[in-house]
Amino acid sequence: MNGTTSPIAARSKRKEPPHTVDGRHPKHHRTNGEVAPAADNTPDNQDEFEGEFGVELEEYEDARLPAVLPTGPDTAEWQATIQRVVRNVVSIRFCQTCSFDTDPALTSEATGFVVDAERGYILTNRHVVGSGPFWGYCIFDNHEEVDAYPVYRDPVHDFGILKFDPKAIKYMPVDALPLRPDLAKVGIEIRVVGNDAGEKLSILSGVISRLDRNAPEYGEGYSDFNTCYYQASAAASGGSSGSPVVNMDGYAVALQAGGRADGAATDYFLPLDRPLRALKCLQEGNPITRGDIQCQFVLKPFDECRRLGLTPEWEAQIRKAFPKETNMLVAEIVLPEGPSHKKAEEGDVLIKVNGELLTQFIRLDDILDSSVGKPVKLLLLRGGEEIEVEIEVGDLHSITPDRFVSVAGGSFHSLSYQQARLYGVACKGVFVCEAGGSFRFDNAENGWLIQTVDHKKTPDLETFIEVMKGIHDKARVVVTYKHLRDLHTLNTTILHIDRHWSKKMKLAVRNDETGLWDFTNLADPLPPVAPIPRKADFIQLEHTSHPAVADLVRSFVHVSCVMPVKLDGFPKNRKWGMGLVIDADKGLVVISRAIVPYDLCDITVTIADSIVVEGKVVFLHPLQNYAIIQYDPKLVDAPVLSARLSSQEITQGASTYFIGYNRIGRIVHAATTVTEIFAVTIPANSGAPRYRAVNVDAITVDTSLSGQCGSGVLVAQDGTVQALWLTYLGERNPSTHRDEEYHLGLATPTLLPVVEQIQRGVDPKLRMLSVEFRAIQMSQARLMGVSEEWIQKVSVANTAHHQLFMVTKRTFERNEQEEAAALLEGDVVLSLNGKIITKISDLDIMYSNEQLDAVLVRNCEELSLKLDTVAADDVETTRAVSFCGAIFHAPHHAVRQQISKLFSEVYVSARTRGSPSYQYGLAPTNFITHVNGKPTPDLEAFLAEVVKIPDNTYFRLRAMSFDSVPWVVTMKKNDHYFPTMELIKDPKEECGWRRITYEGGKVIQGEGPDGVVGSAGEITDMDVDADVCG
């Protein structure tokens, strides 16, 4: 990729926020901590989001607890007031179902309170309602539950209004808390009644200490501005967002919004003047007009204003008109190309608006909201000079996105005023709110602005849509983009546009009448353009004295694998590596299974760094960590060389030549020596089982290059490949939360039987023993009961390694053999079909035999058994179901390797953030045994039961954890954003898989009309996009 991407570190164009009382602070709504503990390494269907707004919730709460103020018993007046208030306070459980603007996809809980019991309006924070799709419900004090949906979210200020059906509350009277912003005074005692720290009801006391602080800053997410906030000491924490701040008479005088995270008990409240106006507009059926001039003002005290140019004459007038005021409004940010551009400047002191002296945000909001589309006159002081300007007031709603388009796995909307204000840029451009699918850029998951697509400028969303309509499926196009943190750098990349896994270009538009976002299909994909043959030449390997070794450059190809759906616990959505061409005439390439883990994927093969062709999976080895893929050789006019694989085992101490490709794809080479050949044990991942190599010999070499390269070969002087150098996926490091990868060699003789069958057009049908072996030395073998005669035979059979193999783990098979006729943990295998087993490659005999004559030692007794092998062709996943944002499929091979009993054939493999599965805690590695009391032993039964469940209704899942702990989860179905979908492997389909959608009681072949990007999608890492081939 040309250009460089911007760093991850948080930095805006604004000055760094001060580490003082006016710094940015976390908002008080609680994310579901119980489903993503710090040590969790199970895959979700989107990127790991460590708490919201950069704060880890549990740490945040622990830091806040010591700061809770001790309070004595409430007076009778307060007790009576609280009893009236709590009836109107609700706990809000909600999902923001996809990333949008400043908000990531998440599940959380917060607080709200009823402000109109007749119409069913609830006031809460805007960062709870969010700017994008919302799905949630409210729980009242008597534990009655009712659905709620947004009818208004303010473009700037931190409040939103939800609507519920008042008739649904049957067992308690619901009143409305009166909003009285006029009663907020310094020194009054208040109570914050809400869902503090995720508890059902908490009542925190405090005293309002300030009415004139600037809005708190929360970092790169949503932040309020152009308003003052109140300050008090109440020690509220996660979950208290949206709580009413009430006085002793039971009036709501403010709205809880945020607080400090450093242990101080300071909290910040939003004044209720603007929420009260919005509520009245809704009650009267009037539009809620919001005006703005794209200039952020802040409150600054008189001493600072003097330094900015406030003259003594104007200060005297202001102090006389407003004796209690100590601050004035000063321009902080003026957005380029906005109404205030070139008229107001940063540092201007605001004196008058339309001839009226003005020092408060509330009055400024009044004027702007009533002047949308009209000019206002501002008198400013700039360095002591009076400047009078006329500025046209814009419509805030028009620069607040209310729609997004999903195409090629990504989602896009117009750049919002929130983002533009944060970074001080013009409020225009195409913003990537969900960087998934084809549009997953490097180094950061959000904050991108698309500049051009396919050499066409995309200044706005409408133009972007038209450009994308004209791009064919599977096209490779040049895209330029910038990051909001670094607009100086223009990044350029080439994207492979995927319109076959996700065929529809969906436009989602906010509907404030229903609270849902309505989906429309804008365009079906244009068919792929037929590829044409292309010509290319390979580079030449310099500084090597062996021409045959140098020629191997022509046997390497670059392989990229993109997986639109997370299956089998695999942690990534895209991988790349170098593959070795083993048959240029047939286009066969061998590559690590750490790069191509399963066949629901898009593979591109790049030859000679020039020719790009499609590839497909031909074979996946169940144990030895390699895959064989195929490209169409007719499309390649280049001198590709078929690598010659050695049939002789490489030995320890042998001289060899290492050729590898390092982390940036550059070829490196060195003469070296084989240091060790050993039976490797790749650690199993403790969190979520995923493919790992077992029962395989690994090779190490004496060169530091080997640790830098994930792809390569060991080659003899005559150019014969002695071993492949592969990446082996290991466990997730509990400290760094990164996946360990091991770089090791695999001897080529073990590949030859499989390669020869594929070259003959035969689909390899391997057999295997369902166990995992570990090498033991003779001292251990003697203690296990191996006789001296067998120990002597081992010494003669393998002079380099005196070892035998013991069974350490049995793989659970669906049709278990009788224990007497099967291998058990602790068995030491002496021979198979008369061959003494002293190295792992001796076990390859199992791949071609349905039954083996085994001699083994069990409990110090030598036994002769006939061992049945099992077919290896049913260990790959061939069917999956996406339901309520989770991916279900039969337990894959890695699960059966690590578990001693299968509880059902319905296994939770992954889940999407912001989905019902995430909200209700249905985690990966669970097994589903019953749906609404009906047994679901397999996917067929599971699918039959879940499609019967009506939309937006509760159902019960009986689950079993990986550690055999049964539990029951109740969930609510959501078909609108997370439709039920079935994926079936089908070689007749163009992309090898068929999709069936079950939505609204209908069975749809292919993709349904609704559903958000990421409905089974990419972990940011999760970030996952499960829209699949229709």
From Swiss-Prot:
Documented EC number(s): 3.4.21.-
Keywords: Apoptosis, Hydrolase, Nucleus, Protease, Repeat, Serine protease
Serine protease: region residues: 89-279
Compositionally biased tracts (Basic and acidic residues): 15-24
Annotated region described as Disordered, given as residue ranges: 1-48
Active-site feature positions: 127 (charge relay system), 158 (charge relay system), 240 (charge relay system)
GO annotations of cellular component type: nucleus
Family membership noted in the UniProt record: Belongs to the peptidase S1C family.
Protein name listed in UniProt: Pro-apoptotic serine protease NMA111
Source organism of this protein record: Chaetomium globosum (strain ATCC 6205 / CBS 148.51 / DSM 1962 / NBRC 6347 / NRRL 1970) (Soil fungus)
